[in-house]
């Protein structure tokens, strides 16, 4: 397990940490900064903050949360949700984020990946992919926290995202998310085999044995 990074993902709505199943039925869990510090104390290697409604309402509201966390937590922080421009990315990086994750805006304008990578480096750009299994055994790219269909194939999009300059991929299985029934290993293997950048598996983790 020496090469495995344990990354705590915190989904945010307004000022609250929330949790759901399949990105639906979201309920308030507590204060995101308190949970971030707890995960840090427990040995998390990184943190990911995702604003679950930012793309829907066209805004990013995580600046203050990120500032507070960055003052108390000394591991890399990735922030996503509602990032639509280089300026949006810069604002979050200035607040203390180490990386920004983009999803919805990148599917509409893939050159945003390149623009942010040129300005801050590929190591700062995470392509967030929300994947939903289809009837033909493939996976479709979803956006807006799993609300909207794109018709895009996940594996193809991951390859294109790398070409545009993404330094990592955050791969969330909507079908497994929140279930604690294990990762979609087939999905993770398919994407990982087609790109040379790190792939972060998200959705379904329930016990430590799943890292083996």
Curated annotation (Swiss-Prot):
Biological pathway: Amino-acid biosynthesis; L-histidine biosynthesis; L-histidine from 5-phospho-alpha-D-ribose 1-diphosphate: step 5/9
Its EC number(s): 4.3.2.10
A biological process term (GO) from this entry: L-histidine biosynthetic process
Disulphide bridges: none
InterPro entries hit by this protein: Aldolase_TIM, His_biosynth, HisF, IGPS_HisA/HisF, RibuloseP-bd_barrel
Highest taxon above the source species: Bacteria
Enzyme class (EC, first level): lyase
A molecular function (GO) term: imidazoleglycerol-phosphate synthase activity
Keyword annotations: Amino-acid biosynthesis, Cytoplasm, Histidine biosynthesis, Lyase
Cellular location(s): Cytoplasm
Reactions catalysed: 5-[(5-phospho-1-deoxy-D-ribulos-1-ylimino)methylamino]-1-(5-phospho-beta-D-ribosyl)imidazole-4-carboxamide + L-glutamine = D-erythro-1-(imidazol-4-yl)glycerol 3-phosphate + 5-amino-1-(5-phospho-beta-D-ribosyl)imidazole-4-carboxamide + L-glutamate + H(+)
Any single GO CC term annotated in Swiss-Prot or TrEMBL for this entry: cytoplasm
Any Pfam family matching the protein: His_biosynth
Active site residues per record: 11, 130
UniProt function note: IGPS catalyzes the conversion of PRFAR and glutamine to IGP, AICAR and glutamate. The HisF subunit catalyzes the cyclization activity that produces IGP and AICAR from PRFAR using the ammonia provided by the HisH subunit.
Subunit structure: Heterodimer of HisH and HisF.
PANTHER family on file: IMIDAZOLE GLYCEROL PHOSPHATE SYNTHASE HISHF, IMIDAZOLE GLYCEROL PHOSPHATE SYNTHASE SUBUNIT HISF/H IGP SYNTHASE SUBUNIT HISF/H
Family from the record: Belongs to the HisA/HisF family.
Protein's recorded name: Imidazole glycerol phosphate synthase subunit HisF
Source species of the chain: Legionella pneumophila
């Amino acid at each position: 397990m020496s090469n495995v990074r344990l990354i705590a993902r915190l989904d945010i709505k307004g000022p609250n940490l929330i949790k759901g199943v399949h990105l639906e039925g979201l309920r308030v869990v507590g204060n995101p900064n308190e949970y971030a510090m707890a995960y840090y104390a427990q040995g998390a290697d990184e943190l990911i903050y995702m604003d679950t409604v930012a793309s829907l309402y066209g805004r990013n509201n995580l600046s203050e949360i990120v500032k507070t966390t960055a003052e108390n937590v000394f591991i890399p922080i990735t922030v996503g949700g509602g990032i639509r421009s280089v300026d949006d990315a810069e604002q979050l990086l200035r607040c203390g984020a180490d990386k920004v994750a983009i999803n919805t805006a990148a599917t509409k304008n893939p050159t945003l990946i390149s623009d942010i990578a040129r300005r801050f480096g590929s190591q700062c750009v995470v392509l967030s992919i929300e994947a939903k299994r289809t009837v033909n055994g493939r996976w479709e790219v979803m956006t807006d926290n799993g609300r909207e269909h794109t018709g895009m194939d996940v594996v193809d999009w991951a390859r294109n995202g790398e070409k545009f300059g993404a330094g990592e991929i955050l791969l969330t299985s909507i079908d497994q998310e929140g279930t604690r029934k294990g990762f979609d290993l087939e999905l993770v293997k398919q994407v990982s085999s087609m790109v040379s950048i790190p792939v972060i598996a998200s959705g379904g983790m329930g016990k430590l044995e799943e890292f083996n």
